[in-house]
């Protein structure tokens, strides 16, 4: 075994790429390390293309092994199971920038598997996983127009930080991942604390500049490995068939794309394509139907793009910077804690907000450690939203990714636990879709949170931008349709407030997207965002003063930390009885903080009263209403507070001499007693005689 190793300094860490020792039967395998965080990346491709396949079957699997952090998995089986949400998001993060780097026409199956085998809790595996993937693909011999670089950028005290540690990110106003080739940015994913557009763009440029050292190192590794490239050539286009397809379908497609309503337009496009295909197959029955479909798709793309570049109105008749018609409603569902219906053209999101207690928070156990998330956002994309049938069940990768993007857009304006001690779950149901449903979810979430009475800092809106570029000519499109997303060169989603950007996601399919183009897109997005915020503010411009009557109201009180055990009781008996009898949820913290949650105000008051009784201190000189619990020859034991008994000596029962206690008292009798003394052992001495002059009993 002859290892080939390449090391370089990258930000605060040393990156090492090694190949030739592990997983040698794969087309390529790279052991990539950043500090003590190490991933094994393997690439395998099938040499033979499956006949009739009309798509590129690339699979990216990212898996975190618990042994990497020195842990044993939980659960009955004690082994890793299905991918977590975090693993799914990382797999998407890697897939997005590498997919456009495979050549057009390449349809051989390729599988990339990234396995985290060692982890430093201060160094997240995402960046080194992307670097390792780029290196493995570059040395595999598989057609790949890389290499690709990757960087994470933080922003602290007005300075950009390259590949910040987990601790540094806690104080950072920005967490931005950027990936690209030597000449082009391909992917951006970020979350920010409402930063100005120029700071966001500066972070993208900074990250792309810094990752050049990665690209250079991978080039050197590729030269040293020197593996022969696959003998693959792009399929030759049948120019005669291209001309026939154009003659038969171009005019019809041009007309079809002037139909504004999506479903009607799709129906007409299908009519045109079917007629052209049938005519070509009638002329030549041996023609490849899939090839015809591909050429019709290419022609469709060309028709739409050429109209936009020529300055004609867009598919639905809008100008490039126009946002579709908006409809905004808050409080649309009667029993939810908060709800909103946000409609932008043919994209619609029904968003609900549910408030819960701290025990409803999501507990995340990953190799980076345990975390608790009080704010959850789930995105659902049912098939009916696009007029189709399909499977309904657990969320797919896309739904998880879109939900996380919307979460990032809102997270910066969420209140702290001290400001609002609730767990919050938002669900966005996409009921109609024609482009930018994740950004509709951002708008709907902002509205639903305010309707629920959540004190978010300010409203947030999101917009999806697109780009069509031919040579030096380009047009930036605001609020793109699904077709414009599919046929365009860039998908550029921006969420933010009036003051700045909270989330930015960018996927670029071509080279040549300059800083100036991105600047224009960000400025155009700002104008669209402010327009949407103005419309949203007409429906609801601030959070409701009161939370819903159906939501649990959380009341917080403080008790002596030494009294926590009294509230819990033996084996939890006291707190269990409290919650069952009052119908409340009670949470105790080590510092003596007690949180009582209930939608019923009277139940909350009763729980508070009983907790105060349990935790109250016996005060010397105070008169209590007590209950006789036991009679003995020398007096009676009286309960004055829950769990606190005192002795009334026979001499303290009455002014006159008492010969027999039972003549004056019986078990269960309520009496007024005054606390005379509490000795060092906590024993309480009571007197009925001394309590008699008191007109009122002390109430605790």
From Swiss-Prot:
It holds the Pfam family S1. Its cofactor is Mg(2+). InterPro entries: ExoRNase_PH_dom1, ExoRNase_PH_dom2, ExoRNase_PH_dom2_sf, KH_dom, KH_dom_type_1, KH_dom_type_1_sf, NA-bd_OB-fold, PNPase. It is an enzyme of class 2 (transferase). The keyword Ubl conjugation does not apply. Its EC number is 2.7.7.8. GO terms for cellular component: cytosol. It is found in: Cytoplasm. Mg(2+) binds at residues 485, 491. GO terms for biological process: mRNA catabolic process; RNA processing. GO terms for molecular function: 3'-5'-RNA exonuclease activity; magnesium ion binding; polyribonucleotide nucleotidyltransferase activity; RNA binding. Residues 621-689 form the S1 motif domain. Residues 552-611 form the KH domain. It catalyses: RNA(n+1) + phosphate = RNA(n) + a ribonucleoside 5'-diphosphate. Keywords: Cytoplasm, Magnesium, Metal-binding, Nucleotidyltransferase, RNA-binding, Transferase. Involved in mRNA degradation. Catalyzes the phosphorolysis of single-stranded polyribonucleotides processively in the 3'- to 5'-direction. Component of the RNA degradosome, which is a multiprotein complex involved in RNA processing and mRNA degradation. This is Polyribonucleotide nucleotidyltransferase. The lineage of its organism: Bacteria, Pseudomonadati, Pseudomonadota, Gammaproteobacteria, Alteromonadales. The gene is pnp.
């Amino acid at each position: 075994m002859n290892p080939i190793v390449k090391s370089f300094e990258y930000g605060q860490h040393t990156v090492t790429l090694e190949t030739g020792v592990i997983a040698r039967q794969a087309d390529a395998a790279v052991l990539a390390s950043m500090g003590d965080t190490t991933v094994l990346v393997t690439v395998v491709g099938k040499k033979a293309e499956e006949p009739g396949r009309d798509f590129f079957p690339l699979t990216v699997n990212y898996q975190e092994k618990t042994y990497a952090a020195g842990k044993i998995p939980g659960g009955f089986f004690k082994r890793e199971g299905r991918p977590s949400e975090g693993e799914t998001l990382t797999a998407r993060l890697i897939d997005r920038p590498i997919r456009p780097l495979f050549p057009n026409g390449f349809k051989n199956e390729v599988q990339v598997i990234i396995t985290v085998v060692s982890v430093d809790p201060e160094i997240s595996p995402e960046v080194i996983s992307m670097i390792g993937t780029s290196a493995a693909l570059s040395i595999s011999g598989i057609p790949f127009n890389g290499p690709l670089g990757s960087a994470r950028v933080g922003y602290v005290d007005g300075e950009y930080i390259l590949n910040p540690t987990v601790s540094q990110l806690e104080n950072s106003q920005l967490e931005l991942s950027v990936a690209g080739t030597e000449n082009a940015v391909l992917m951006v994913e970020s979350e920010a604390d409402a930063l100005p557009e120029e700071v966001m763009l500066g972070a993208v440029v900074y990250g792309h500049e810094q990752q050049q050292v990665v690209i250079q190192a991978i080039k050197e590794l590729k030269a040293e490995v020197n593996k022969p490239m696959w003998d693959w050539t792009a399929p030759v286009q049948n120019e005669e068939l291209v001309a026939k397809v154009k003659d038969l379908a171009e005019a019809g497609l041009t007309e079809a794309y002037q139909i504004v309503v999506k479903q009607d337009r799709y129906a007409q496009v299908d009519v045109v394509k079917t007629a052209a295909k049938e005519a070509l197959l009638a002329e030549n029955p041996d023609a490849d139907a899939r090839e015809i479909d591909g050429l019709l798709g290419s022609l469709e793309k060309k028709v739409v793009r050429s109209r936009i570049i020529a300055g004609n109105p867009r598919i639905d008749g809008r100008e490039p910077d126009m946002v579709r018609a908006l409809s905004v409603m808050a409080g649309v569902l009667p029993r939810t804690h908060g709800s909103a219906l946000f409609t932008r053209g043919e994209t619609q999101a029904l968003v609900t907000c549910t408030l819960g207690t701290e025990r409803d928070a999501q507990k995340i156990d990953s190799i980076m450690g345990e975390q608790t998330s009080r704010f959850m956002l789930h995105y659902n994309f049912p098939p009916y939203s696009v007029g189709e049938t399909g499977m309904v069940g657990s969320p797919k990768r896309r739904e998880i990714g879109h939900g996380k993007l919307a979460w990032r857009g809102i997270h910066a304006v969420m209140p702290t636990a001290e400001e609002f001690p609730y767990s919050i779950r938002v669900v966005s149901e996409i009921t109609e879709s024609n482009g930018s449903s994740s950004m509709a979810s951002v708008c709907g979430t902002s509205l639903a949170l305010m309707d629920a009475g959540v004190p978010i800092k300010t409203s947030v809106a999101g917009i999806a931008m697109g780009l069509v570029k031919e040579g030096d000519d380009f047009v930036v499109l605001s609020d793109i349709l699904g077709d414009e997303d599919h046929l365009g060169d860039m998908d550029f989603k921006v969420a933010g407030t009036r003051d700045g950007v909270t989330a930015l996601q960018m996927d670029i399919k071509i080279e040549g997207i300059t800083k100036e183009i991105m600047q224009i897109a960000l400025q155009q997005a700002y104008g669209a965002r402010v327009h949407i915020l103005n419309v949203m503010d007409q429906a609801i411009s601030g959070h409701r003063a009161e939370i819903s009557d159906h939501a649990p109201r959380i009341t917080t009180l403080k008790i002596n930390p030494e009294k926590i055990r009294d509230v819990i009781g033996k084996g939890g008996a006291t707190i269990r009885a409290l919650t069952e009898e009052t119908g409340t949820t009670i949470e105790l913290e080590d510092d003596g903080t007690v949180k009582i949650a209930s939608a019923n105000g009277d139940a909350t008051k009763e729980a508070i009263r009983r907790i105060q009784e349990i935790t109250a201190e016996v005060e010397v000189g105070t008169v209590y209403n007590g209950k006789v619990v036991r009679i003995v020859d020398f007096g009676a034991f009286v309960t004055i507070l829950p769990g606190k008994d005192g002795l009334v000596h026979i001499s303290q029962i009455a002014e006159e001499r008492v010969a027999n206690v039972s003549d004056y008292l019986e078990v269960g009798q309520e009496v007024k007693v005054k606390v005379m003394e509490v000795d060092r052992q906590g024993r309480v001495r009571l007197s009925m005689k001394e309590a008699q002059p008191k007109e009122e009993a002390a109430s605790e």
